[in-house]
Amino acid sequence: MNIFKSESSKRFSDAVKAKSTLLEPQLGPLPVYRIPLKEEKIKINGCRFFSFGEPSKFGSKQQSRTIMVLGATGAGKSTLINGMINYILGVKWGDTYRFKLVDEGQTKCQAHSQTSEVTVYKLFYRDGFEVPFSLTIIDTPGFGDTRGIERDREITVQLQNLFASKDGVSEIDAVCFVAQAALARLTSTQRYVFDSILSIFGKDIAENIRILVTFADGQKPPVLEGIIESGVPCPKSKDGIPVHFKFNNSALFADNKSADTQSGDDDEENFDQMFWNMGTKSMKRFFTALNQIETKSLTLTNEVLRERKQLEVSVENLQVQVRLGLAKLEEIRETREKIKEHEAAIKTNENFEFDVSLKKPVQVDISGSGDYITNCQQCQVTCHFPCGIPNDANKRGCWAIDQNTGRCRECKGKCNWNVHFNQRYRWDYKDVTEKRTVKELKENYEKATGQKMTVEGLMRQLKGEYDIMQNEVKKLMEKSTKCLNRLKEIALKPNPLSTPEYIEMLIEGEKQEAKPGWKKRVESLMKMKEKAEFMAKVEKGEKPLSRQESLDVKF
């Protein structure tokens, strides 16, 4: 049933107002109403779904458009979305009320977790809409807030969940970047926001990117030069200017009552009305253009997201494997040098003790951290941390598991998914010093090979063991390089956090801006830079660590 069906004498926006909730306290000159929304029972991690109205009786024949709205914290994204809803519902300058879809005032008072979800609003078409279609708005949390890079990475994971789920979003019409008009050059944070989002999309989405400029006036927005300079892939006009739409929502909730005293107030009202009219024209232009854009499937984007996540998991494990390989090589060299150094003593006494440095596996408690993990019970290694899957019965869905074979891509034994568990600890490695004797070493290898072992044979066995590990590392590196090359083929932009120079730029930006929590964010970025440097060498076919060069040469 259409609860908004209005009588001929009643405008559609008035009918919606009658069903809406007045927001209190009233913060501005006009009362503001939250439109009636129904929360949908769709379970996708990190996402919430709301609908306005009911689906058309025409079903799938009813035209529908989907937009995603993105922006850095403070770019004016929430106000812009509220401007859209007032336009769609037909609110006029002279009306004595306004609507809100996104209530920034309320969300700021709530815990971070309440404002951290990707929110999907489905506005079902009704007679009285100013647009001829149903509209889905994907509202993302603001990028670049005080919670830092880790929080921003969570947002991309939430979008990934939304695009990959059968109940989520499978196609898109416009990816809308909200940017402030006055930014002559993009800050490192702004550029990071653009590149982070672009990196999750397939190349076929480039034509659907639109720039929404906020706090605009009648002039050419300076931010367009910054967008051109930063290389954001988006459609451009004949003169090379990015396709954009200008908005100034300063008049959205402004006083529209006629001034009956000072002429100065009269001028101010005319000024506000001018901005309102400008906003209405911009909205009309934007939604007319939206109705002409070719809808794109998110199939390629899902492929980008899947391959990038698999690469991240592999890189984490690759670093561990290479370091373990290097530690094993050092252990072999140290053992050989000690045997040579004490050769005379060993000949007369096989129980002669010497110290050797090595890495030992240890369990690190993660209980209480809120993180899940995937550990291989057979190999006693951590295959994926943090993992988004808490239930062991669902571990086949972990990023470390090959979905075709059901076997782990990361652990040494390539074990079946059902021997992988969510546990209260992760496996790590610590440097220890152990006492060794040649007799013990020989006995261990004799037990393994069934052959009598000489000191020379012992050294060959140690070297052979290292060669096996080195070969495994090489295979991992080749797999990662293959994945990197595939991402270059299909992704719209590389992941900004995969480039050491880019991360260094972010670090310098954090230091200069010195916003609250900057030291913690810099610390996080330094760790990412180390990973990025590691991966850059892998991609070039170089030895990932400088120590590896020297150890390989000297052995």
Which role does the model predict for each range below?
Residues M1-F555:
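Conserved GTPase G-domain substructure that encodes guanine base recognition and part of the catalytic core
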